[in-house]
């Protein structure tokens, strides 16, 4: 047999078993590719997670820094508001409230706890003001008073001697002797003027001292009597001498500019002179419900008129209403110290039934009790028998009202 005859009976090896070797090769290749793709996919997923976490961290850091800046700006705004409202020391205010809360609320009629030393310090303020007006020099020695009066007596004696020397005592006096006498009298007058100048210097020192009202009035009467004597003597010598004229002028200007000082401890009202202007000052000690006109229904404040005799004949007071007996221009002032939890407090000064002055305070804080004062004042022309009274804007507002306190008061004096 030849090859050609055997060719139909021979089949290729790849065609046996339905192509099994080719299928196995493709499956292995696919598995190999799948195994290679799994790490790549996992790597991409991990990289994405890292990028997301990094982005989230950056965003969170930026957000925190922005919030920190906003917090700092808010703190600055709060600090500025505290400075404007004057509440930088809230802790100290809280301590003050804890210390005086019971005294201000539970015992409203208890006398204010001011010691005698504090009262003396208040009186010292008047003396210090008077001393400052006189070049800030204080003279408190009583011996200088006696020395000043001795100098004044010596000056009067010299004036009498000078007047006697200028009066002719003998009809036989020659003209030459007359010229000698006139020259000597002129020299004496010069000495008298120097002595009077030194007396004025001592007198200014004496005016700086604190004296009682009775001593000042007695001294003023003595000076007026001496002033009359000096005026008569200077008028007799005016035609021949030049020194008495300026002496009389200095004396008149000195008496014109005299002013009275108040001794420590005396009331301003009791220390006034006879020609002083009427004045009255009240410490607000109580209140009562009052229904007024014009829609004002607040409580009326009543003052403690312990100085009744000081303004008798000028003012009349009854149930918190002050009546003026003399027509004129008056200065009215008032202050109330509030201690409550309200944000707004205030009062009105009425002229009759018409509001004249108004005071309103706003304290927007979170403190349980807010202690603050409200003060107002002004000028007003009042006719005879016109009335002035003080009334709160609201009802039942807790205020510091006690006998002898210096926080709530009301006053008036004639200008």
From Swiss-Prot:
The residues on the Cytoplasmic side of the membrane are 1-37
User: Where does this protein have compositionally biased stretches of type Acidic residues?
Assistant: 114-137
User: Which GO cellular component term is one of those annotated?
Assistant: plasma membrane
Query: Which InterPro entries has this protein been placed in?
Result: TNF_CS, TNF_dom, TNF_Ligand_Superfamily, Tumour_necrosis_fac-like_dom
Q: Name one GO biological process term.
A: positive regulation of apoptotic process
Q: Which residue pairs form cystines in this protein?
A: 359-374
Q: What is this protein called?
A: Tumor necrosis factor family member eiger
Q: Provide the gene name from the record.
A: egr
